Curated annotation (Swiss-Prot):
SUPFAM superfamilies assigned to the protein according to its UniProt record, in alphabetical order: (Trans)glycosidases (SSF51445), Glycosyl hydrolase domain (SSF51011)
Organism the protein comes from: Aspergillus oryzae (strain ATCC 42149 / RIB 40)
Keywords associated with the record: Carbohydrate metabolism, Disulfide bond, Glycoprotein, Glycosidase, Hydrolase, Polysaccharide degradation, Secreted, Signal
Example of a GO biological process term: polysaccharide catabolic process
Alphabetized GO MF terms: alpha-galactosidase activity
Cystine bridges: C124-C157
TM stretches of this protein: none
Protein name: Probable alpha-galactosidase D
Enzyme nomenclature, EC number: 3.2.1.22
Tagged with keyword Secreted: yes
InterPro entries xrefs: Aldolase_TIM, Glyco_hydro_27, Glyco_hydro_b, Glycoside_hydrolase_SF, Melibiase_C
Length: 657
C-alpha cells in the first residue's frame, strides 16, 4: 500500500493530535441528522403555512421515509420581547396556532420538531428584532422541552458583549465556546433529549470543542447561492474531516439542491460531497407551497438512496481529499464504508464535459471487483488500476468500489498472463518516475533456484533477484515510470502467485535547505509544530520565493509538499473567498506547476498556538523537467498577481520521490 505521504494528509502537532473529541453522547445523531429547514428559500420570513406545507411534502414525496425527518423553522419565528415571565414566545401573526401545536402537527406526521435560536441577544436576521437566548439559556431550554422540541439549531449573531453585540463579529474578543456550553448544559438538564446543532460559523476552530457540546458544528461561514461556494466549503472541510464520527458531525451547511441555483450536475456534486463527508443533510428548497414545487430532477437527487446510504453508513468515517489537480481542474475525495467498501468522488471543476480517469492507487486501492457509477447508473467489473468515465461540466463521478485489493498488490490471476516460465503483469502503477521501487515476487512453491529475472518496460535492463532462504520470495529494486501503463515480466522456474510493489521513500528537503528571495523569510514555530521541521518559510509571493538545488534522476517526479494555510474565509466568504492559497513549483526553469492548497489549520485562528499557522498538511503534485544531477527547484506564487491569492501558503519542506 502506498505510504500516507502520497495523499493529502495532515501532520499532527506534538500537542493535540486530531482524534474524536470527547462528545455529547445522549444516543442521538449516531448518523448525521437529515431534514428540512426554512432558511435557504424563505430566509428569515417563515410562517406556519409554509412549514406545514413543506412538512407534508416530506411525507408525500417519500423523503421522510428516507430519513429526512427534522423540520426546523429558522430565523424570524419569534418576537422582540419575552413574555412577562421571561419565557420565549412565537410571532402570533406568523404562527397563529403556536409552536406547541406546530410540534404536534409534525409529530403526528412522524416527523421531528426543530427550532432555531441564537447564542446572542437577538436572532440573526434582526431587525425586525427577534429575541435571542443569551442569559436565558436555562429558561429557554425548559421552554423547548415543554414544547416537545427534538432539535435546536443555535446561531451566533449579536453575541459579543465586549464589542457591543454587533450583528456579526468574526474576530470576537473571546471564544464562542462558553455560550454554546451554557445552552448545552441547559438542554442536558431537561427530561428530553434534543439534537444540538452548534452554528458558530467555523469561528475558533470548533472541531476541537463543539463535539463535547453538540451533535454537529458548522465548519465555516454560510453557504451562498453560487457554485463557487462548493469549492470554498470543501477547502474548509479538509482539516476537519478527521473529527467526524457518531454523534459529532461536521456541518457543511444546508443544501441548495432544488433551489434553482445550481445546474443538475452541480447539484449532484453538492449532494455527493455533503453526503460522503458526513455532513447533516438538510434540504433548503421549497418542496411544496402555494407558489412553488421542487422540480423532479432535483427531487431525485435528494432521494438517491445509495448516496443517502453513504451519508448514513454505520462506519461513520468521513471521506477526505486525496489528490488535487488544479490546472487540470479536478480532484478526488474518498473514504471507507462498512462492509469493506470504498466511496470515491472525482469532481470536474471545469466548464466542460469530458472524460476523467481515477487511478485507484490515489485512493489506496489497486483493484475493484465491482465499481458502481452512481450518477451514470452503470456498473463495471474487475477494474484494474484505473477507471475512466464521462462527466458533465461541474459534475462528479461518484463511485462505490467493492471487493477491493490494496494498492501495490498484484495477484497473478488478476493482473498477469503466463507462458511457460514467463509471467507478464500489466497495469502497473507508478506514482513517480524512479529506479527505486521495491518489488517482492511471491512464488507458488519453494524454489531451489537462486534467481528470478525481472524486466520492466521502464528500462531495457534485466534485473536479477535472488530467491529468499525460504525459497518462496524474491525481492529487488526496479524502475517504473509515473502513470499506470507500466508492465513487468517475471521469468522464474516456479509459477508466480503475485507481486507486491512499494514506491520509494524518497528524500526529504526541509525549508532550511532552501534560500529565500524577495519578501520570503524563514520563521521558527513553537515546539512540536510546523512538523516535521519546526520552522517554515512565509511571505511566499510573486516576488518572494524559496529556492534549492536538489540532486535527482531524470523523469517526472512526485513531490509531497508540506505546507501551512490558515487563511480562513470569513468576510470574503460572501464574495470570492476560497479558503485556499496558490502555490507554484518550477523545476529547472520549466513552466511551473500550480496547485491551490486547502486549509491546514487545526487550531483556533484567534486563540490557538500560532493561530493555526503552525499546523502542517501534505499535498502531492506531479512535476516534470527533472534531469540527472542537480536540479533548480523554486517554490513560489506565480500568477498571484493575476487573480489568484497574493500570498502562497507557508512552506515547511518537500519530499522528492
Amino acid at each position: 500500500m502506498l505510504p500516507k505521504i502520497f495523499y493529502l494528509s495532515l501532520l499532527p502537532a506534538a500537542l493535540g493530535h486530531p482524534h474524536l473529541q470527547p462528545r455529547l453522547d445522549n444516543g442521538l445523531a449516531r448518523t448525521p441528522q437529515m431534514g428540512w429547514n426554512t432558511y435557504n428559500h424563505y430566509s428569515c420570513s417563515p410562517n406556519e403555512t409554509i412549514v406545514r406545507s413543506n412538512a407534508q411534502a416530506l411525507v408525500d414525496l417519500g423523503l421522510a421515509s428516507l430519513g429526512y425527518r427534522y423540520v426546523t423553522t429558522d430565523c424570524g419565528w419569534t418576537v422582540a420581547d419575552r413574555l412577562s415571565d421571561g419565557s420565549l414566545t412565537w410571532n402570533e401573526t406568523l404562527f397563529p396556532k403556536g409552536f406547541p401545536a406546530l410540534g404536534k402537527y409534525l409529530h403526528d406526521l412522524d416527523l421531528l420538531f426543530g427550532v432555531y435560536q441564537d447564542s446572542g441577544i437577538k436572532l440573526c436576521g434582526s431587525p425586525p428584532d427577534n429575541v435571542g437566548s443569551l442569559y436565558h439559556e436555562d429558561q429557554d431550554a425548559r421552554t423547548f422541552a415543554s414544547w416537545e422540541v427534538d432539535s435546536l439549531k443555535y446561531d451566533n449573531c449579536y453575541s459579543d458583549a465586549a464589542t457591543g453585540y454587533p450583528n456579526v463579529n468574526y474576530e470576537p474578543s473571546t471564544s464562542p465556546q462558553p455560550r454554546f456550553a451554557n445552552m448545552s448544559r441547559a438542554l442536558a438538564a431537561q427530561n428530553r433529549s434534543m439534537v444540538f446543532q452548534v452554528c458558530e460559523w467555523g469561528i475558533d476552530f470548533p472541531a476541537r470543542w463543539a463535539p463535547a457540546l453538540g451533535h454537529s458544528w458548522r465548519i465555516g461561514n454560510d453557504i451562498i447561492p453560487h457554485w463557487r461556494a462548493i469549492y470554498r466549503t470543501l477547502n474548509q472541510a479538509v482539516p476537519q474531516t478527521s473529527f467526524a464520527g457518531p454523534g459529532q458531525w461536521p456541518d457543511l451547511d444546508m443544501l441548495f439542491v432544488g433551489n434553482d441555483i445550481l445546474s443538475i450536475p452541480e447539484e449532484q456534486t453538492h449532494f455527493s460531497l455533503w453526503a460522503i463527508l458526513k455532513s447533516p443533510l438538510t434540504i433548503g428548497a421549497a418542496l411544496k407551497d402555494d407558489n412553488t414545487s421542487i422540480n423532479d430532477e432535483s427531487l431525485q437527487i435528494l432521494k438517491q438512496e445509495e448516496v443517502i446510504g453513504y451519508n448514513q453508513d454505520s462506519l461513520g468515517v468521513s471521506a477526505s481529499l486525496r489528490r488535487r489537480w488544479t490546472e487540470e481542474g479536478y480532484e478526488v475525495w474518498s473514504g471507507p464504508l462498512s462492509g469493506g467498501r470504498t466511496v470515491a468522488a472525482l469532481i470536474n471543476w471545469k466548464d466542460e464535459a469530458r472524460e476523467l480517469t481515477l487511478d485507484l492507487p490515489d485512493i489506496g486501492l489497486q483493484f475493484a471487483g465491482t465499481v458502481k457509477n452512481i450518477w451514470d447508473g452503470t456498473t463495471a467489473q474487475n477494474v484494474k488500476t484505473s477507471y475512466t468515465a464521462k462527466v458533465q461540466s461541474h459534475g462528479t463521478i461518484l463511485l462505490e468500489l467493492q471487493d477491493t485489493t490494496a494498492s501495490g498488490q498484484y495477484p497473478t490471476d488478476t493482473f498477469a498472463t503466463s507462458t511457460d516460465s514467463s509471467t507478464t503483469f500489466e497495469s502497473i502503477y507508478g506514482v513517480t518516475t524512479s529506479f527505486r521501487y521495491n518489488i517482492t515476487v511471491k512464488l507458488s512453491e519453494a524454489s531451489s533456484s537462486g534467481d528470478v529475472n525481472i524486466q520492466s518496460t521502464a528500462s531495457n535492463k534485466t534485473i536479477t533477484a535472488q530467491v529468499s532462504a525460504s525459497g518462496t520470495e524474491a525481492s529487488a529494486q526496479i524502475p517504473l515510470l509515473a502513470g499506470s501503463s507500466n508492465s513487468i515480466t517475471i521469468v522464474s522456474p516456479q509459477s508466480v502467485d503475485a507481486i507486491t510493489i512499494t514506491p520509494p521513500n524518497g528524500t526529504y528537503f526541509p525549508n532550511t535547505a532552501f534560500t529565500t528571495t524577495g519578501d520570503a523569510d524563514t520563521v521558527s514555530c513553537g515546539a512540536g509544530y510546523c512538523q516535521p521541521v519546526g520552522s517554515k518559510i512565509g511571505n511566499i509571493s510573486t516576488n518572494g520565493t524559496a529556492r534549492a538545488v536538489i540532486p535527482a534522476t531524470a523523469g517526472t517526479k512526485y513531490l509531497a509538499i508540506d505546507y501551512i494555510n490558515n487563511d480562513v474565509a470569513f468576510d470574503s466568504a460572501w464574495d470570492w473567498g476560497s479558503n485556499s492559497r496558490n502555490l507554484t513549483v518550477s523545476v529547472n526553469g520549466n513552466k511551473p506547476v500550480r496547485i491551490e492548497v486547502p486549509l491546514s489549520g487545526q487550531h483556533s485562528e484567534l486563540f490557538g498556538p500560532g493561530k493555526g499557522w503552525w499546523d502542517t498538511a501534505t499535498i502531492g503534485v506531479l512535476t516534470e523537467g527533472w534531469k540527472d544531477g542537480d536540479n533548480d527547484v523554486v517554490i513560489g506564487n506565480e500568477g498571484g498577481e493575476s487573480g489568484f491569492t497574493s500570498y502562497g501558503p507557508d512552506f515547511v519542506g518537500l519530499r522528492v520521490l
